[in-house]
From Swiss-Prot:
This is Bifunctional protein GlmU. It comes from Clostridium beijerinckii (strain ATCC 51743 / NCIMB 8052) (Clostridium acetobutylicum). SUPFAM superfamilies: Nucleotide-diphospho-sugar transferases (SSF53448), Trimeric LpxA-like enzymes (SSF51161). It catalyses: alpha-D-glucosamine 1-phosphate + acetyl-CoA = N-acetyl-alpha-D-glucosamine 1-phosphate + CoA + H(+); N-acetyl-alpha-D-glucosamine 1-phosphate + UTP + H(+) = UDP-N-acetyl-alpha-D-glucosamine + diphosphate. GO terms for molecular function: glucosamine-1-phosphate N-acetyltransferase activity; magnesium ion binding; UDP-N-acetylglucosamine diphosphorylase activity. It is found in: Cytoplasm.
Length: 455
């Protein structure tokens, strides 16, 4: 059977008080709308239409990589009106459509699959995703009879008996497409808000004798984010889910409460993550790594048996058995080889560092290609910027760079070379050479006495 999905993402989001469209606020590093789209896609639904309104162009721009179509809701006149704006998408389609809201980032793939399966197997005309809550105040109640769902009653319209019902409407549904399109044409805005409610379609189908079903899920999956407080609540719930998944997969989190792991991060088994770490984007961390406290790793590939201590790594690759930090800054487009050592207060930008190379402390390397088994003394600076352009430095294998050295780019240091401490290198150093580029030491005898400085 053909299955498709609509995602309502046109709302103003006034309570979140932001210039950014509400559905583009992030939860665990990913926009809420993308969370919803990705869960739908993982459930096997490829045909997805997003109803957009506020910030439409930005919403399109941020979701271009999700291969969805768009329908425009120029005026926000209710959920029924939003779905009606997707009539062109639904035109001539037969099968089942699920309707979601773009501000429910916690919905699970398995729940979506269950919703579709129940709808199809029970031969329902409409199926509502519901949840049981201790305090359903403000939510629409699900009224059931022996033959399924009888109606959805808004909180303000509930009788005393209906107020006791703790099964609430999540705002997520499945419909037979043709029946939905017909019901949408019969919905009116004859209510206190002057809006077209999608819930009225349920009542219309029920009045026609159609079968309405419901699938119950956990309340947290149905949470809609309408404020910064709810955004933080969703963040906490998803963070806990992610951390639990990694621990179940063989990763040790010393303190899950203070460990932030983005939803797309991958971590190998027997890796230990210490407190106060932030792992974001498409980061991949290998097996048997130690990520000590206060590190931030974004969109980077970390090999096996790597130690990272209190460092920032951005869009870079770190080879197996390498140590980084403490207090290292690995900037984008950097690749560090295996068995390397990047020490304290080292900054590396857009450079390649070979296997076994040691850059132990207080060094800047930018726009450089560094070979294997090199050693950088304390205070080395690759001078890559002339005030207008960046230039490249090449350093061969087995080179030794003495302390307090400046390498003025563009410059090439060949294999097996030594650079004397305190040198400023501005020209090529041939293989096997020692380069000394500093003023000759001169001692002035008796100078302290002559100046009257002796203590």
């Amino acid at each position: 059977m053909y299955k498709c999905a609509l995602v309502l993402a046109a709302g103003q989001g006034k309570r979140i008080k932001s210039d950014l469209p509400k559905v583009l606020h992030k939860v665990c590093g990913k926009e809420m709308l993308k969370h919803v789209i990705d869960s739908i896609r993982k459930s096997g639904i490829d045909d997805i239409d997003v109803i957009i309104g506020k910030g439409a162009e930005l919403v399109k721009e941020r979701t271009l990589d999700r291969n969805v179509s768009y329908s425009m809701q120029a005026e926000q006149l209710g959920t029924g009106h939003a779905v009606k704006c997707a009539e062109e998408f639904l035109k001539d389609k037969k099968g089942v459509v699920a309707i979601f809201t773009g501000d429910t980032p916690l919905i699970k793939q398995s729940t979506i699959e269950r919703l579709f399966n129940e709808h199809i197997e029970a031969k329902n005309s409409a199926t509502i995703l519901t949840a049981i809550v201790n305090d359903p105040t403000g939510y629409g109640r699900i009224v059931r009879t022996n033959d399924g769902v009888s109606k959805i009653v808004e909180h303000k319209d509930c009788t005393e008996e209906e107020l006791k019902i703790n099964e609430m409407n999540s705002g997520i549904y499945c419909f037979d497409i043709e029946l939905l399109v017909d019901a949408l044409n019969k919905i009116t805005n004859n209510n206190g808000q002057g809006e077209y409610y999608l819930t009225d379609a349920i009542g219309i189908l029920k009045s026609q004798g159609k079968k309405i079903g419901a699938v119950v899920t956990e309340y947290e999956e149905t949470i809609g984010v309408n404020s910064r407080v709810q955004l933080a609540e969703a963040e906490e719930i998803l963070k806990n889910r992610i951390n639990l998944m990694h621990m179940e997969n063989g990763v040790t989190l010393i303190d899950p409460r203070t460990t932030y792991i983005g939803i797309d991060v991958e971590i190998g088994k027997d890796t230990i993550i210490y407190p106060n770490n932030i792992l974001e984007g498409n980061t991949k961390i290998g097996n048997n790594c130690l990520i000590y406290q206060n590190s931030r790793i974004v969109d980077s590939n970390i090999g096996n048996e790597v130690d990272v201590q209190a460092s920032v790594i951005l869009n870079s690759n770190i080879g197996d058995n390498t140590t980084v930090g403490p207090f290292a800054y690995i900037r984008p487009e950097t690749t560090i080889g295996k068995h390397a050592r990047i020490g304290d207060f080292v900054e590396i930008k857009k450079s390649t560092i070979g296997d076994g190379t040691k850059v132990s402390h207080l060094t800047y390397i930018g726009d450089a290609e560094v070979g294997s088994e090199c050693n950088f003394g304390c205070g080395t600076v690759v001078v890559n910027y002339d005030g207008k352009n960046k230039h490249k430095t090449i350093i061969g294998d087995h080179s030794f760079i003495g302390c307090n050295t400046n390498l003025v780019s563009p410059v090439t240091i060949h294999d097996n070379t030594y650079i004397a401490a305190g040198s400023t290198i501005t020209s090529e150093v041939k293989e096997g050479d020692l380069a000394v580029a500093r003023a000759k030491q001169r001692n002035i005898s008796g100078w302290v006495d002559k100046k009257g400085l002796k203590k």
